[in-house]
Amino acid sequence: MLRLTLASLGVAMNNLAATYSDLGRHQDALVMGEKTLEFQRRVLPENHPDIGISCFNLGISCHIVGDLHRALQFAREALRIFQATLPPSHPHVTQAQQLVLRYEGDTARRS
């Protein structure tokens, strides 16, 4: 039961990071997203899909603030986790694949 409570706390933290982003507080979203990921890595199994969601969201936050290298790293990690834990047709897998392709293109154009 405690693990479920801790997992729920991670989801709430991730939701707070998303809310910051929705409000245009992108630096706050990035900080909260990093805290969320750190927390989830302590309390969840290594390839838990919630960790993938946090990586996905952090990728978006990094991209918004202009850190394309980290954005691509987080997007790739999200994709790796989703491919390891979800069926290939799951929307998270598709969204992460699209994000990786987009960020690879952005990174190549910036080089």
Where are these regions (language model features)?
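Intrinsic-disorder-linked linear interaction elements in eukaryotic regulatory proteins
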Residues: 1-111
